[in-house]
């Protein structure tokens, strides 16, 4: 109630003045009358702050009842009472106000009563804090003062009080009845919880914080949110038969309670046929401090019993301060809830105001609950209203309308029923936002679906300058809608309590324009040069004023605005404008137009538009225009028609039969195999001519297009192409389209491509106009893995104790697909397990193991794990188990245990290092042990290794190394071998390589001990495994392995001496010479046949004639 605490700084006023108005509807944009707080009256106490004149309003036919809850009294009997509050009756004709006195008594010190507190204190009682009544002078008027209190020797009892009169026909109240049922002493404070808790029952009731008069004038519903420790309740005050009057049955209290309802001014008027019912909130489990009864109303909510009046009241602090509202009926001392509405924001004060009205014309009452402290994002106190549309059987459809302004306007502080202000069959409402600058009121129209989403009109405070009391709070007081000027349309008033003013807004009649434009035919023949256009128009309105029923219209007709193929004969342009007087009767005008035919535009219709509006506008002034009318801004303001060209088809619109099919589309695509994916489509028309045939295509992945043909365009990942170079596609014609998608970034499991063809006409068989291709996407990558030892081969004759082996590996992707995550694992054997023992034989000095990997010029992180899958080194760029200076490093496992790996002696499988004496003992005992036993132990290793030799070596080495003399040391038998695993993860792209450098030291003493006769070669085999994420079976890639193992030989591999080669060559030459000589001696080279032929020729010389003949032939 403290307005000062809610005022905004004046700095916002200049900004608010710049806010553009929503297009005005039928209320005047400025008030027709301003009614100010009366200054001519004599007040006994000076007014030091705003009287809040206009806080509550009840409009009647010729006057308006105005509440000013902080006004000083003009009565002599109340001359010493501060801010009694006042009710004024103000003339709607001249704006003159006079006090409307409901209670002329001052403060009362009543004699002691056994039953009730009868003394009265009216200081700051807020008379007019709530007020309600119908819009006729014959309707009842209910006025309340919620801060009225009764003093006692110990407390002040904030009971509240209300007054009502049967009508306001007379200029002064007649037969005022007071309602004050909370004065019984026995009901002030009650014990609860078996006497362990005291409850403020009636003592702080605040009767009259809200008040409502039912439309039939037979019932009052009054809120008392302070009852029962602010659980709150309502007082239903209604007509009852005398025998049903509960006050008549109360022993010894009937006279005291009857004073509750008696006429203030006369003891002769006792309406005993009215009685209050006060439900006890504890009986239905109302929460403490929930303020039930803060706002009240009534309506016909039950679709199964549409004549039963039910009630609605709010509890803004219920539901953990999110607020609730209930539809209920009063049943004795309790209520029966039919439905519960709830707010959605903590502290939004859901239920500050409530309104019950049928908004969609279905005969069922709907509910609006305001939440003026609803917060928009990054703000507060913006406000909202919750609209609950009654769908029947207490099912409600919720709609939330948030403040149209972003300031802290407290939109929804006041709600009012305006009735059907535009006569469209639906009731409308006003919503106050009194703290939007100086205040704003929004008008919302009802519709078939409830309230429209946007306000039809916004009424700002007439003055943007603050009053002497601050911002005006324009819109905190709203009257109902009432036709005060007799034009058939409801007017209403708005109160601005902090400006101490009431503003009257009259409503203009609403008219509807019915206008059409059409051509004499829907088709234009190619040879046709002229077309006749007809424009028709008329008005309709519910107004009975003859001056309103006829309005001047401004009409503008435009044709073919884009191509301008048509022009009016009269203007020689494609537009014509004129004015006409329209009324209830339809009138028409004809216009002749000239048409220019164009073959290429035959498929483009000629658009025909007629724009119309009232010429006489509502003036932006305080003067009401008696002959003006207004059109609903949501009504159409243009009439349209299209005219087509004749196409030679059987009907006005051609029926084509387009067929679409894709050609040679592969069902699968290997990701990365190409940057573009091409699809070919063929389109055939087997129906009538297809005008403006078009083809569009898109993909579910919204792929970009690699190429856009000249006859195509791309809009939002959809390519649209004009077929047949933009010309019509005749029957039997075929066209084709090639589409190229950019698939360089494509991923996923499948690609779905949708294609469609269409034309401007009808389609005989739409099912074959669409083509959907589902292409399965697969990944495949070919990987080359190669590598081996880069330093010289080790033999035990030239190396002793230990030797370092350096390996380089390269893993390269040959594509085509990218592997999103490839895990590369190297398995490196480091020690043998001794059968039947817990000891192990270390082969590779794990502390010397160093690895460095790079990919695409970037170092890769390497994770190192032991045989128990315990991570030893986490994400280093270089794996090493030695520190600078050659010191041994303690390896920390994930379970925070630590151990050192030593290069000499035997280490237990538990990775616990033996102490020095144990290592020495083990070394000495090994030298003294039985050779037979030692051989047997090595034979056991050799036998296991020999079994796997052929399987574990590559094909190149299977032929080079003797099977029966080679031992293979690898990680494929976890029962015999201890290994470590180096793991890397990489986003593997084609033509990119992983390069790994690995080096470690080998304990040659152990190797030498193992290589007993007949074993000659010790092979260290490092395994490589690749794992692709999402492919546990590794079907989407292949590996070409060329990885060479590390070979340690027992003896040096010697080459063939050069002198042996020279001797062999000489010996070969001598042997060849000897063989050739022997063959010559034995006549192998003699040619006997040739010698015989030569001898025969000599014995038979050629005849001369033949010789001469031969010579003559040559001449």
Curated annotation (Swiss-Prot):
Keyword annotations: Behavior, Cell adhesion, Cell membrane, Cleavage on pair of basic residues, Cytoplasm, Differentiation, Disulfide bond, Glycoprotein, Integrin, Membrane, Oogenesis, Phagocytosis, Receptor, Repeat, Signal, Transmembrane, Transmembrane helix
Listed GO CC annotations: apical plasma membrane; basal plasma membrane; cytoplasm; external side of plasma membrane; focal adhesion; integrin complex; lateral plasma membrane; membrane
Record's protein name: Integrin alpha-PS3
Organism encoding this protein: Drosophila melanogaster
Lineage: Eukaryota, Metazoa, Ecdysozoa, Arthropoda, Hexapoda
GO BP terms: apoptotic cell clearance; axon guidance; behavioral response to ethanol; cell adhesion mediated by integrin; cell migration; cell-cell adhesion; cell-matrix adhesion; dorsal closure
Subunit description: Heterodimer of an alpha and a beta subunit. The alpha subunit is composed of a heavy and a light chain linked by a disulfide bond. Interacts with mys/beta-PS and Itgbn.
Single annotated GO MF: integrin binding
Similarity comment: family membership: Belongs to the integrin alpha chain family.
SMART domains membership: Int_alpha
Tissues and organs where the protein is expressed, per its UniProt entry: Expressed in embryonic and larval hemocytes (at protein level). Expressed in tissues undergoing invagination, tissue movement and morphogenesis such as salivary gland, trachea, midgut endoderm, dorsal vessel, midline of the ventral nerve cord, amnioserosa and the amnioproctodeal invagination. Expressed in the mushroom body neuropil, brain areas that contain mushroom body processes in synaptic contact with other neurons. In egg chambers, expressed in border cells, in stretch cells and in dorsal appendage primordia.
